[in-house]
């Protein structure tokens, strides 16, 4: 069994990460899951959430927006709309986005077309704040 696995994170705009890592955890449609070297191949969809990987004993957290996560041999490919490392997130901007989403949701009902859009914006802002908080604690 390999000791490390290759992790690639790709957005429509760039390859965000290409590293050898020890383990990965992420948030899928069915909840949080983890992958270690030698894991069986699989493909799953990702929710808005956190991806954490460990490299040489150091944990790195990232905020992800919807996408796909595939394991094949000792390689993980993550295709997502956006991916931000905890130290790249502007906490004030995330708080402002949270406020805008909360304000919009107060004016809407679940039947409104824009309700799901602002609900997702709220979820993204909360995840970004959670992940950014991890960088602040380091």
Curated annotation (Swiss-Prot):
<dbReference type="GO" id="GO:0005524">
    <property type="term" value="F:ATP binding"/>
</dbReference>
<dbReference type="Pfam" id="PF00401">
    <property type="entry name" value="ATP-synt_DE"/>
</dbReference>
<keyword id="KW-0139">CF(1)</keyword>
<keyword id="KW-1003">Cell membrane</keyword>
<keyword id="KW-0813">Transport</keyword>
<keyword id="KW-0997">Cell inner membrane</keyword>
<dbReference type="GO" id="GO:0045259">
    <property type="term" value="C:proton-transporting ATP synthase complex"/>
</dbReference>
<keyword id="KW-0066">ATP synthesis</keyword>
<comment type="similarity">
    <text>Belongs to the ATPase epsilon chain family.</text>
</comment>
<keyword id="KW-0375">Hydrogen ion transport</keyword>
<dbReference type="GO" id="GO:0046933">
    <property type="term" value="F:proton-transporting ATP synthase activity, rotational mechanism"/>
</dbReference>
<keyword id="KW-0406">Ion transport</keyword>
<dbReference type="Pfam" id="PF02823">
    <property type="entry name" value="ATP-synt_DE_N"/>
</dbReference>
<protein>
    <recommendedName>
        <fullName>ATP synthase epsilon chain</fullName>
    </recommendedName>
</protein>
<comment type="function">
    <text>Produces ATP from ADP in the presence of a proton gradient across the membrane.</text>
</comment>
<dbReference type="GO" id="GO:0005886">
    <property type="term" value="C:plasma membrane"/>
</dbReference>
<keyword id="KW-0472">Membrane</keyword>
<dbReference type="InterPro" id="IPR020547">
    <property type="entry name" value="ATP_synth_F1_esu_C"/>
</dbReference>
<dbReference type="InterPro" id="IPR020546">
    <property type="entry name" value="ATP_synth_F1_dsu/esu_N"/>
</dbReference>
<dbReference type="InterPro" id="IPR001469">
    <property type="entry name" value="ATP_synth_F1_dsu/esu"/>
</dbReference>
<comment type="subunit">
    <text>F-type ATPases have 2 components, CF(1) - the catalytic core - and CF(0) - the membrane proton channel. CF(1) has five subunits: alpha(3), beta(3), gamma(1), delta(1), epsilon(1). CF(0) has three main subunits: a, b and c.</text>
</comment>
<dbReference type="InterPro" id="IPR036771">
    <property type="entry name" value="ATPsynth_dsu/esu_N"/>
</dbReference>
């Amino acid at each position: 069994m390999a000791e490390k696995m290759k992790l690639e994170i790709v957005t429509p705009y760039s390859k965000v990460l290409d590293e050898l890592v020890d383990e990965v955890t992420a948030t899928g449609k069915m909840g949080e899951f983890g992958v270690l070297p030698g894991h069986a191949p699989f493909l799953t969809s990702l929710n808005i959430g956190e991806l954490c990987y460990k490299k040489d004993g150091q944990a790195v957290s990232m905020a992800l927006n919807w996408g796909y996560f595939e394991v094949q041999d000792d390689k993980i490919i993550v295709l997502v709309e956006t991916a931000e490392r905890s130290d790249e997130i502007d906490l004030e901007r995330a708080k402002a986005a949270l406020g805008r989403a909360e304000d919009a949701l107060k004016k809407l009902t679940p039947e409104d077309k824009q309700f799901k859009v602002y609900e997702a914006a709220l979820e993204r802002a909360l995840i970004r704040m959670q992940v950014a908080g991890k960088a602040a604690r380091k």
